[in-house]
């Protein structure tokens, strides 16, 4: 899959929607035994639990938070697939700062956060400093394909009132929030500006901090269909994409193609998508930051077709959960249950039905995986680091 075909979810003033394999040695993660009660870590927390990195809202060492994606009608079908004790602990939504199709409505945003809280879910909110997303063909025709407004956010005040609205809404909410600022930052489908994006990220974080907002953890998110230049710096030392350890609480990564999570690590022109995944995870470890998988789904497989569902489990889900098991810095995952053929952005690119509710026997495999004691569900959010400060 090329970068152009990897589209983010259509953004909204409030939307409650809501890579080519190359040559090289084939490598995949090896899952350790993960049926025992987790433990270990270095930092103490509530009830004397320990935390590997000590990050805000990090789960105890050895635990992985179970989260859900962003389409309400599909989320409703996901709930009965799992027992009450294994319901998701977080839910993803998208906000676009410059959406021109829908009115800006802070009250609606506040209501969405409250609705998630009522279900026992921590909001994972994508704050996108851009407007409406063009289709790939339209993007190719733009005079300036860097169409996002991150440069305007970084260098002016035009969007400050909307950003301040978010500051006020999140502060009034008082409960834990993960804020993913400009998710999939280096993907050309988002149109963000190198060197300007990290300045916009820093400005947004500093607006929250200036207002005394301390119930928000800030998330920096990559997608491996994009170039692997996330750690690149210019001659003066400025980062092309990385906002800095002082404003990033969590690293994040999104997975859709099977080549993102296993396979060759190199291609004819350098690293493969999986190689870029491992490079990004290594950067997170070096920075001593936990990782949240903010979006994930097996977009190449139709789960409504038994043969494809079977292939999806062996080629996507099994390597996915093995990667999580083999990389302890991954502390949180979000599954997007959705029939991508119903969304014009995705249907045109060949994305398929990833609604778990139609996947038949595979549901039992998924439920069995989430029954392992390492997964942290809605009933256990009080175990997250610092969670008790924001009840």
Regions found by a protein language model. Name each.
Residues 15-18:
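C-terminal motif of bacterial Sec signal peptides marking the signal peptidase cleavage site
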Residues 20-24:
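Bacterial signal peptide processing site
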Residues 45-159, 298-301, 309, 334-341, ...:
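N-terminal substrate-binding region of glycoside hydrolase catalytic domains
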Residues 49-74, 177, 292-391:
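Substrate-binding cleft of secreted/luminal carbohydrate-active enzymes
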Residues 86-96, 238-269, 336:
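Aromatic- and acid-rich polysaccharide-binding/catalytic face
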Residues 99-222, 356, 366, 379-380, ...:
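Substrate-binding cleft of extracellular glycoside hydrolase catalytic domains
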Residues 107, 111-128, 246, 256-303:
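Glycoside hydrolase catalytic-domain groove-lining segments
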Residues 209-235, 288-302, 332-338:
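Aromatic-lined carbohydrate-recognition surfaces of secreted/lumenal glycan-active proteins
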